[in-house]
Regions:
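N-terminal beta-loop-helix "entrance" segment that forms/cooperates
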Residues: 44-61
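Donor-nucleotide binding loops and adjacent catalytic segments primarily
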Residues: 52-54, 190-277
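Short internal beta-strands
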Residues: 37-44, 239-245
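Leloir-type glycosyltransferase catalytic cores
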Residues: 156, 318-363
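A donor-sugar binding/catalytic signature common to diverse glycosyltransferases
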Residues: 99-100, 111, 122-123, 150, ...
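Short alpha-helical donor nucleotide-sugar binding micro-motif in glycosyltransferases
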Residues: 85, 89, 273-278
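Active-site and donor-binding regions of nucleotide-sugar-utilizing enzymes
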Residues: 4-9, 15-26, 30, 54, ...
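A nucleotide-sugar donor-handling region in carbohydrate enzymes
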Residues: 44-49, 68, 146-220, 320
Length: 363
């Protein structure tokens, strides 16, 4: 009997994490296993963040279904996703729903799945900030609490998942699916034309990314942080390359700083090459920090916590919060080449998705 799996993505970063699972399902099909999948996106078909190159780079097809939800209010978004995803499940026989990470749309899909009596699996389970005032922390608690199967990326996540949900859920430490992509795409990565255009040399620039609304919406704080890293790097003659979008780009552009190169948002392969060959990275993205650990690139995270503490305990990541003085201090350590010794966490081996699919096939 065919096993029908529905994979839900709520935003662009989710596709990067589910892509290895989709490729593993396709390989399982080629090997004669009875397994089908559909990819459902909570957003709209014309979402500008879902450029064709993203799917080409990841070697997956675009979503089969778009729920078409597009709103800023998280409660409204949750309600719309629940309503539309429920209709989808009623019309499409599904054995397992896979959700990833901790978005409001992810939580909405998880709730509907359980109400329909369908098996629910959560990738990147057991991640916690331990700050219940954060909407995403509430999402994580709800999703993990409802899930039948919890797929964790590391030992600390596994410990949390076992402690909180072992009686109701099956917990599997499968490793980090994000790393599957890097290993899969390594041979296809090539030096982007942008680096020639900007005369950038491998190992002689810092990449800066900003995506967290908490930072971007606080103009004074964002300017302070950007100024801290750019001025420190400029003193050392090292350019800061910043692929920024929207409000963040406008704010930084208005600062008129020397030593920063504002560039367009890059495709996944080009961005991966850019970060893998940087002297260091300053980011507020957990995904970027995880990839930096795998690539052995020093990383400064503009946050006081990380969902994957292995990137700090074992990897190249250092947390500075939103503290501009500490950011200056760590940027100078980076520029002096005095970064801490680091390694790669257990099971970040590029085979996480294969483990996930085989577990689901056997359920």
């Amino acid at each position: 009997m065919n096993k029908n799996i529905c994979i839900v993505a709520g935003a662009r970063p989710n596709f990067i994490k589910v892509a290895p699972v989709i490729r593993a399902i396709v390989n399982a099909q080629k090997n004669g296993q009875s397994i089908n999948y559909s990819l459902v996106y909570a957003g709209c078909e014309d979402d500008p963040t879902l450029e064709d190159s993203l799917f080409d780079d990841l070697e997956i097809s675009r979503p089969d279904i778009y729920l078409g939800v597009d709103c800023e209010n998280l409660n409204e978004l949750t309600g719309q996703v629940m309503s539309k995803f429920e209709l989808y499940l009623q019309q499409n026989p599904t054995d397992v729903v896979i959700v990833v990470d901790d978005l409001a749309s992810t939580m909405a899909a998880a709730i509907v799945t359980k109400k329909q009596g369908i098996l629910l699996a959560h990738i990147a389970a057991g991640t916690r900030s331990f700050d219940i005032t954060m909407p995403k922390e509430i999402n994580r608690l709800v999703i993990d609490g409802l899930s039948d199967i919890l797929f964790t990326a590391g030992i600390s996540n596994n410990s949390i998942a076992n402690k909180e949900g072992a009686e109701l859920s099956k917990v599997y430490m499968v490793g980090n699916v994000l790393i599957d992509n890097i290993r899969f795409l390594q041979q296809r990565m090539k030096r982007p034309q942008l680096m020639d255009d900007k005369q950038l040399k491998e190992g002689r620039y810092i990449v800066l990314t900003l995506n967290r609304k908490a930072i971007i919406n606080n103009s004074e704080e964002m300017r302070s942080l950007v100024s801290a890293v750019v001025s420190s790097a400029h003193e050392a003659g090292v350019p800061v390359v910043a692929p920024l979008r929207g409000k963040a780009r406008q704010e930084v552009e208005a600062m008129g700083l020397e030593g920063i190169m504002l560039i367009e948002a890059q495709g996944y392969l080009d961005f991966s090459y850019l970060t893998a060959h940087a002297m260091g990275i300053v980011t507020d993205s957990g995904n970027v920090a995880e990839e930096a650990t795998f690539n052995g690139v020093p990383c400064i995270t503009l946050n006081s916590y990380t969902e994957h503490i292995e990137t700090v305990k074992i990897g190249t990541n250092v947390l500075v919060g939103e503290d501009a003085d500490r950011l200056v201090l760590m940027t100078k350590v980076l520029l002096r080449g005095e970064w801490k010794k680091a390694g790669i966490p257990d099971r970040w081996d590029g085979r996480s998705a294969d483990r996930i699919v085989q577990i689901l096939v056997n359920e």
